């Protein structure tokens, strides 16, 4: 069984608050203060979850430098109160950094259709027509 330290639990909470502030900042028409606060919380929480050394090693791998520069550059642009441009740069950097994780996430979401309760829920949401045409 995986043991989770108290610092990692705090990191999950801080990362969750960071994602919340980022989404709330986007909902409020790219409020630069909320986006900047969310970015700082997200990066702090990530470093608490996986550790400073692993965070640094993840972001500064040779094949991920382009994504890292766009992501951290976007964070800097948001901190300089250019939220729309900063979030666009961050989004591109995020996709570049985490593109290796997307197949795993989509595979997990695809397996959610095999869970008994969720499969019936998805069928009800889909409607009575099971035809693909």
Curated annotation (Swiss-Prot):
Compartments, as annotated in UniProt: Golgi apparatus membrane
Sequence ranges on the Cytoplasmic membrane side: 1-9, 53-68, 114-133
Keyword hit for Magnesium: no
Major subcellular site: Golgi
Gene Ontology cellular component annotations, sorted alphabetically: cytosol; endoplasmic reticulum; Golgi cis cisterna; Golgi membrane; nuclear envelope; trans-Golgi network
Stretches of the chain found on the membrane's Lumenal side: 31, 90-92
A Pfam family it matches: Got1
Xref: InterPro entries: Got1, Vesicle_transpt_Got1/SFT2
Residue ranges crossing the lipid bilayer per the database entry: 10-30, 32-52, 69-89, 93-113
Keywords: Golgi apparatus, Membrane, Protein transport, Transmembrane, Transmembrane helix, Transport
Biological-process GO terms, alphabetical: endoplasmic reticulum to Golgi vesicle-mediated transport; protein transport; retrograde transport, endosome to Golgi
Membrane topology recorded in Swiss-Prot or TrEMBL: Multi-pass membrane protein
Source organism, top-level taxon: Eukaryota
Family (UniProt): Belongs to the GOT1 family.
Record's function text: May be involved in fusion of ER-derived transport vesicles with the Golgi complex.
Name of this chain's protein: Vesicle transport protein GOT1A
Organism field: Mus musculus
Lineage: Eukaryota, Metazoa, Chordata, Craniata, Vertebrata
């Amino acid at each position: 069984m995986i043991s989770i330290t108290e610092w990692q639990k705090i990191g999950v909470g801080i990362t969750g608050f960071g994602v919340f502030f980022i989404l709330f900042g986007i909902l409020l028409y790219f409020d630069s203060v909320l986006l900047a606060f969310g970015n700082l919380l997200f990066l702090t929480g990530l470093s608490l979850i996986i550790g400073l050394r692993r965070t640094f090693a993840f972001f500064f791998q040779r094949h991920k430098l382009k994504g890292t520069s766009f992501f951290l550059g976007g964070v800097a642009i948001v901190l300089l109160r250019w939220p729309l441009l900063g979030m666009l740069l961050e989004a591109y950097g995020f996709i570049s950094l985490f593109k290796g994780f997307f197949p795993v996430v989509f595979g997990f979401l695809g397996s959610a259709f095999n869970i008994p309760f969720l499969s019936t829920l998805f069928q009800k949401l889909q409607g009575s027509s099971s035809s693909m045409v």
